[in-house]
Amino acid sequence: IPTFNEIENIEKIIRKVFSLQEVFHILIVDDGSPDGTAEVVKHLQQEFGTQLFILERKGKQGLGTAYIAGFKWSITKKYDYIFEMDADFSHNPDDLIRLYKSVHEDGIDVSIGSRYIKSGKVENWPLNRIFISYGASLYVRMITWMPVKDCTAGFVCYRRSVLEKINLDKIRFIGYAFQIEMKFRAWRNGFKLKE
């Protein structure tokens, strides 16, 4: 979970994830939040022990680089399933179970929490952001023929093998286009994606 000034949400999102039926570990990648986000996480580490980790970075370096740092950390720790999600509850933590089951039980390599399929929805977003995101996904599908309706989705479960195959050091985008590039590279490498 990448963070920058998420003091309002961070404890709630951590507690919610840890309340789920499945056992999850959480890595917070904090980009030097001046609001005390990292301090809240460190305090919660006393309660959650070896399930909660923090990677503190100096200054705001971009969403994509935060995810890449988290992915590299997760690969070294040998996690089989690696998730990405936001801290602001724009992704429903209850759906982590659905993403996990899709990869673990259904043989999918990349499970995408899509906002633009029949059962998907958008939470806590203004209308203009929805239009921009949907338009970007439509444009990407037209250009690449990638069979993903929500190319900019940031709620994803990857098998570790996908992240090991993609050369994370060659990812070019550090902003929201990072989401598109990751899905495209997974698809081009022959991995199975499901929304």
Predicted regions and their residues:
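Acidic helix N-cap motif at the loop->helix transition within catalytic regions
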Residues: E8-K12, D35-L44
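Residue-level signature of catalytic and energy-coupling elements of molecular machines
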Residues: I10, V17, G70, D88, ...
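Short beta-strand/loop segment that forms part of the nucleotide-sugar
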Residues: I14, V23-S33, L55-E56, M85
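Short helix-capping segments at alpha-helix termini
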Residues: S19-E22, Q45-Q51, K78, E105
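A conserved acidic beta->alpha catalytic loop
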Residues: D30-E39, F89
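Acceptor/aglycone-binding surface of glycosyltransferases and processive sugar-polymer synthases
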Residues: R57-T76, Y81, P93-Y176
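Catalytic donor-sugar/metal-binding loop of nucleotide-sugar-dependent glycosyltransferases
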Residues: P147, K170-I174, K183-E195
